[in-house]
């Protein structure tokens, strides 16, 4: 335990904070091209076919990104925008594709949480 005088002289050393989305290089989003679109299964207690894409970013880094929502129109060579945010039950998936921008269409027939899935407001009848 240091004395007050030692703390005044030296101070505490701050630990370096590690980025959770290093491929974005401190940018909020990055554009990229899908190199492969496929499904994979999640970790142990869960069971599903999660839709993911391998994306080559404009800075040359290739990452794995999750495609949120029900149904998508992405295929190889689709241009997408990605953001940070991992998927807890998919190891190695640290990014999300933003729906409703570039080639990624919004989720069809979605009424709640539309802004997160790039869906326009439905027309009133």
From Swiss-Prot:
UniProtKB keywords: Methylation, Ribonucleoprotein, Ribosomal protein, RNA-binding, rRNA-binding, tRNA-binding
GO biological process terms, semicolon-separated: translation
Domain of life: Bacteria
Keyword Ribonucleoprotein belongs to the record: yes
Bias-annotated ranges (Basic residues): 111-125
Positions where 3-methylthioaspartic acid occurs in the chain: 89
Pfam family, any one: Ribosom_S12_S23
Disordered as annotated region, ranges: 1-27, 103-125
Record flagged with keyword RNA-binding: yes
InterPro entries associated with the record: NA-bd_OB-fold, Ribosomal_uS12, Ribosomal_uS12_bac
Assigned GO CC terms: small ribosomal subunit
GO molecular function: rRNA binding; structural constituent of ribosome; tRNA binding
The family this protein is said to belong to: Belongs to the universal ribosomal protein uS12 family.
Subunit structure: Part of the 30S ribosomal subunit. Contacts proteins S8 and S17. May interact with IF1 in the 30S initiation complex.
Protein function: With S4 and S5 plays an important role in translational accuracy.
Protein name from the UniProt record: Small ribosomal subunit protein uS12
Lineage: Bacteria, Bacillati, Bacillota, Clostridia, Eubacteriales
């Amino acid at each position: 335990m240091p004395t007050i005088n030692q703390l005044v002289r030296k101070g505490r050393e701050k630990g370096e904070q590690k980025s959770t989305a290093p491929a974005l290089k401190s940018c909020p989003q990055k554009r990229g091209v899908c190199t492969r679109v496929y499904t994979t299964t999640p970790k142990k207690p869960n069971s599903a076919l999660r839709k993911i894409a391998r994306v080559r970013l404009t800075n040359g880094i290739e990452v794995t990104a999750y495609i949120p929502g029900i149904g998508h129109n992405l295929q190889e060579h689709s241009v997408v925008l990605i953001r940070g945010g991992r998927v807890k039950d998919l190891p190695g998936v640290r990014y999300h594709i933003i729906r409703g921008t570039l080639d990624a269409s919004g989720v069809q027939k979605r009424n709640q949480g539309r802004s997160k899935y790039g869906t326009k407001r439905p027309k009133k009848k």
